[in-house]
C-alpha cells in the first residue's frame, strides 16, 4: 500500500499521470472536506470532516485509474484513491489545533496577507475530525 499526505498526495497523482499545479491562494486552516465516495475503510462514517490544510499546490486532474474520495471548496481533489492500494490526502491529520496555530503564525506572519492568516486562525476551534481521518488511513493500509 502507498499513502501520500499533502506533497505525497500530489506526488502520487503526478507520478501516475495526473496534473498538479500551484493555485492562486494558499489552502490553510481547518476546512471541511465532503466525502464524495464512501469507501469500506471509512468508519466511523461522516458526510464531511474538518481537517487542517497547509498547501499552495494541489491536484487538478486525477491520475489514470484515480477516483475522488473527498472534495473541499478550496480543493476539488482533497483525497483520492487509485485501486485498492494507493491513497492520497491533501490535508494534514497530524496537525492538532496547537500545532496548526504555531505553524500558521510562524510561517505566514509578515510573509502573506494578514487576512489569510486571520482566516486560518479563526478556524482553529472549528469541528475537527483528524483522529477519524487518521483511523481511515490505517484501515486503508491494513486492508491492502
Regions found by a protein language model. Give the residues of each.
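Cysteine-nucleophile active-site neighborhood
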Residues: 1-39, 50
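Amide-donor transfer/coupling interface in amidating biosynthetic enzymes
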Residues: 21, 36-144
